[in-house]
């Protein structure tokens, strides 16, 4: 197309004019590249140890640059990777349901919340010392951690199957109605958690609905491992969390790519109508996908409650985490869920650890800002996600 560059005589839309001049695809990409380069240089070279930062109440965190404080850098990097493993466990289930069923399962965080409390109650019931908000790890055997995991996954899988069969199946194809149904389920679950959990409290102590509780890792995980990496010793429990995330990823890959059921699910993600037209009972496939997705939320709840805690309002938090991972990685993509989790983990941990804070706070809230910056960058250049495909 021959373009007349004279002002007032150039035909076409504004977007065509911009494309003709080569602005789109140049300035935004250059700005994104500059931001990424600056972020890397900031962490590696620029940032200072704790002290004044520009006057006033602003100060840097306790971490120096990677060059001047490689040990702290290595610990933050490991924290980011292990947190990403937990994100992947939870978000991969959300991605599976979203990718196949086109259901934005707003109750996914509620599966996590309920699963965490169920695991806590089971572990407390199994241990004669379980009369308080938490057990010490030396009091917990491997079986006393594995049993709550198995019970929690089974209960949440059954609950998820009930939600799918009784509520979602009869509204298949009505995306808005299904989203509203899952919102209703999440509200009901959150209220019931406040009303009934935790059951085990210290003797004589009042019970407040939705108290923060945690379950204990097995005793053998409560030590530090010398990784020979910048002389860093790191928590074995967090390394176990990383190993569990990798194991879940391998298991999902083998299931999705090496079994007939996985092949059908991947076909359903790509083209539900054609899969159904080939004589495959798509309702059974949907049920399997929903059960697996709910089970992964429960699995992640046990791991997350072991490493941290579970409390009311965390359902919304983990739903948001899952949404971010799916938006960044791409809907229905296992590799996208892994990469999205890793990127989110890196952004979350490094921004919280290396950016300035105010007053006596130990960390910053820039992780929230940079999370949305990550979303904006991905949506600007890959609206379908890094590994998603256009319809």
Language-model-derived ranges and their functions:
Residues 83, 233-311, 334-340:
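Helix-loop-helix "hairpin" substructures at the membrane interface of multi-pass membrane proteins
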Residues 1-58, 219, 270-277, 281-284, ...:
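Cytosolic-side transmembrane-helix boundaries in multi-pass membrane proteins
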Residues 62-65, 69, 78, 100-162, ...:
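Membrane-embedded helix boundary and interhelical linker motif in transport proteins
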Residues 62-67, 138, 166, 170-174, ...:
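Transmembrane helix-bundle core of multi-pass membrane transporters
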Residues 145-153, 290-297, 301-373:
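Transmembrane alpha-helical segments in multi-pass inner-membrane proteins
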Residues 72-122, 162-177, 273, 326-335:
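Single transmembrane alpha-helix segments in multi-pass membrane proteins
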Residues 2-90, 118, 131-149, 174-179, ...:
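Membrane-interfacial amphipathic/re-entrant helices at transmembrane-helix boundaries
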Residues 130-185, 192, 339-344, 348, ...:
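Alpha-helical transmembrane segments within multi-pass membrane transporters and channels
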């Amino acid at each position: 197309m021959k373009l007349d560059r004279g002002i007032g005589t150039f035909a076409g839309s504004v977007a065509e004019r911009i494309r003709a001049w080569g602005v789109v695809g140049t300035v935004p990409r250059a700005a994104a590249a500059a931001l990424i380069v600056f972020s890397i240089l900031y962490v590696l070279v620029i940032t200072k140890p704790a002290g004044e930062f520009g006057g006033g109440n602003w100060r840097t965190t306790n971490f120096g640059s990677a060059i001047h404080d490689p040990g702290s850098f290595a610990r933050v990097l490991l924290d980011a990777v292990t947190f990403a493993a937990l994100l992947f466990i939870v978000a991969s289930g959300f991605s599976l349901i979203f990718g196949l069923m086109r259901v934005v399962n707003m109750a996914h965080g509620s599966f996590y919340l309920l699963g965490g409390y169920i695991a806590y109650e089971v572990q407390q019931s199994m241990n004669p010392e379980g009369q308080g908000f938490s057990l010490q790890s030396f009091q917990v055997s491997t079986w006393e951690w594995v049993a709550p995991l198995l019970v929690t996954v089974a209960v949440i899988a059954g609950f998820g199957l009930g939600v799918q069969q009784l509520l979602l199946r009869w509204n298949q194809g009505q995306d808005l109605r299904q989203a509203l149904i899952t919102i209703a389920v999440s509200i009901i679950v959150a209220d019931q958690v406040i009303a009934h959990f935790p059951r085990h409290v210290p003797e004589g102590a009042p019970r407040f609905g939705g108290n923060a509780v945690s379950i204990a890792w097995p005793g053998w995980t409560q030590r530090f491992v010398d990784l020979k990496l910048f002389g860093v010793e790191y928590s074995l429990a967090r390394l176990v969390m990383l190993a569990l995330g990798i194991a879940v990823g391998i298991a999902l890959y083998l299931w999705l790519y090496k079994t007939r059921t996985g092949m059908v699910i991947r076909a359903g993600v790509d083209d539900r109508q054609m899969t159904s037209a080939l004589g495959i009972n798509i309702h059974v496939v949907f049920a399997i996908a929903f059960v697996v997705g709910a089970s992964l939320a429960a699995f992640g709840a046990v791991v997350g409650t072991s490493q941290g805690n579970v409390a009311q309002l965390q359902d919304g938090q983990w739903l948001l985490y899952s949404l971010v991972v799916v938006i960044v990685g791409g809907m229905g993509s296992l590799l996208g869920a892994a990469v999205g989790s890793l990127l989110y983990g890196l952004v979350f941990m490094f921004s919280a650890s290396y950016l300035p804070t105010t007053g006596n706070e130990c960390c910053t809230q820039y992780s929230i800002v940079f999370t949305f910056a990550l979303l904006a960058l991905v949506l600007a250049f890959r609206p379908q996600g890094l590994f998603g495909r256009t319809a």
